[in-house]
Amino acid sequence: GIPCGESCVWIPCLTSAIGCSCKSKVCYRD
């Protein structure tokens, strides 16, 4: 539920390396 400061409209979350995932076109962590 914490925004990672990255969008995932066109590309996947690069922040997935630190546990972020794409939700509603924005990368979130928990």
From Swiss-Prot:
Disulfide bonds join 4-20, 8-22, 13-27. InterPro entries: Cyclotide, Cyclotide_bracelet_CS, Cyclotide_sf. Transmembrane segments: none annotated. This is a cyclic peptide. There is a cross-link at residues 1-30 (Cyclopeptide (Gly-Asp)). Signal peptide: none annotated. One of its GO terms (biological process) is defense response. Keywords: Disulfide bond, Knottin, Plant defense. Belongs to the cyclotide family. Bracelet subfamily. Probably participates in a plant defense mechanism. The presence of a 'disulfide through disulfide knot' structurally defines this protein as a knottin. This is Cycloviolacin-O20. It comes from Viola odorata.
